[in-house]
């Protein structure tokens, strides 16, 4: 069973609002990820197709008039169909996003953030970045403030390379260090996502000498020219060979997908992997994963639940 996005609920008729509940923060999958170069400052240049899926965290925001920013873990390990809850770090990206927006807008208002964390950490699914983006969008409404779009994108990029994507409203072709975002259309599709229990460090992957950093530049036109089902098999993930060497369970999870006659690929810097679920394969045909791996049958979203905010 997949946790789907729900419509946010606002409380309070006067500005600013008193609270906004049930704010979704969807995960992403990288359909491919190419490293095309490296800047003088050490940042890697990439090309990727980012796709939103219906595996979501949920955030709740309650206004504080004392200017303080607080946060609570509302994850319930016993929620049916949702699996084990993800623990929150001491200071997550949602809190950092709230503080950054508060400073940028000069508001004296604060917020209490409740976070139901479901997207796995160290998965390459952008959970923390998505939380930050949803926080930026919701707090502009809660506090009655608005940053110009260019300033909001710059603030988002300062929080993390994936955060601007989650502000873009839908699937996207992403280039540079994450700041060049072009909307793309993708056909509706279902996927199996597998997250082995082990995670790994993103810096360890990018610092590996054997990482391929010179993949030929692709084009959106070349990507879109593929037949409908083939866009989900375009290119490769340049991080995957290094990640598999550092984290053997990634290879094991890919082998498991292959045993189900599914072509798997790692998303982002891992350790989650995914495969397209053909239309003629019933969900009940996909068995559970070994041990404490997490598995979800997900659908891609045609738009971010907060598109237009």
UniProtKB/Swiss-Prot annotation:
Catalytically driven reaction(s): 4-CDP-2-C-methyl-D-erythritol + ATP = 4-CDP-2-C-methyl-D-erythritol 2-phosphate + ADP + H(+)
Function of the protein: Catalyzes the phosphorylation of the position 2 hydroxy group of 4-diphosphocytidyl-2C-methyl-D-erythritol.
Amino-acid positions noted as binding ATP in the UniProt annotation, renumbered to this chain: 120-130
Active site: 28, 162
Protein's name according to its UniProt entry: 4-diphosphocytidyl-2-C-methyl-D-erythritol kinase
Keyword Nucleotide-binding listed: yes
Native species: Polaromonas sp. (strain JS666 / ATCC BAA-500)
Record key words, sorted: ATP-binding, Isoprene biosynthesis, Kinase, Nucleotide-binding, Transferase
EC number from the UniProt entry: 2.7.1.148
Uppermost EC category: transferase
Family of the protein in this entry: Belongs to the GHMP kinase family. IspE subfamily.
One GO term (biological process): terpenoid biosynthetic process
Pathways involved: Isoprenoid biosynthesis; isopentenyl diphosphate biosynthesis via DXP pathway; isopentenyl diphosphate from 1-deoxy-D-xylulose 5-phosphate: step 3/6
Listed SUPFAM superfamilies: GHMP Kinase, C-terminal domain, Ribosomal protein S5 domain 2-like
Pfam families cross-referenced by the UniProt entry: GHMP_kinases_C (PF08544), GHMP_kinases_N (PF00288)
HAMAP family: IspE (MF_00061)
GO MF terms, alphabetically ordered: 4-(cytidine 5'-diphospho)-2-C-methyl-D-erythritol kinase activity; ATP binding
Keyword Nucleotide-binding: yes
């Amino acid at each position: 069973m997949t946790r789907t996005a729900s419509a946010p609920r606002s409380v309070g008729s006067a500005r600013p609002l008193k609270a906004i509940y049930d704010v979704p923060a969807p995960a992403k999958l990288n359909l491919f990820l190419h490293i095309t170069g490296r800047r003088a400052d050490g940042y890697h240049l990439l090309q990727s197709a980012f796709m939103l899926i219906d595996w979501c965290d949920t955030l709740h925001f309650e206004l504080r008039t004392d200017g303080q920013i607080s946060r609570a873990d509302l994850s319930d390990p016993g929620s049916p169909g949702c699996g084990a809850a993800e623990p929150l770090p001491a200071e997550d990206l949602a809190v950092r996003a709230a503080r950054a927006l508060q400073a940028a807008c000069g508001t004296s208002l604060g917020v209490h953030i409740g976070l139901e964390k479901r997207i796995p950490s160290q998965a390459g699914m952008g959970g923390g970045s998505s939380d930050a983006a949803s926080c930026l969008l919701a707090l502009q409404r809660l506090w009655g403030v608005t940053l110009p779009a260019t300033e909001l994108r710059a603030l988002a990029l300062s929080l993390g390379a994936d955060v601007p994507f989650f502000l873009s409203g839908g699937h996207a072709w992403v280039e540079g260090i994450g700041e060049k975002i072009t909307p793309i259309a993708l056909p509706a599709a279902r996927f199996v996502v597998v997250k082995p229990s082990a995670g790994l460090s993103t810096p360890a992957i990018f610092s590996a000498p054997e990482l391929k950093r010179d993949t030929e530049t692709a084009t959106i036109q070349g990507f879109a020219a593929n037949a409908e089902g083939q866009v989900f098999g375009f290119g490769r993930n340049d991080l995957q060979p290094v990640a598999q060497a550092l984290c053997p369970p990634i290879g094991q999870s890919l082998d498991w997908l292959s045993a189900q006659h599914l072509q798997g690929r790692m998303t982002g810097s891992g350790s989650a992997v995914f495969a397209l679920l053909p239309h003629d394969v019933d969900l009940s045909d996909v068995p559970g994963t070994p041990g404490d791996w997490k598995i979800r049958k997900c659908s891609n979203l045609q738009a971010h639940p907060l598109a237009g905010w």
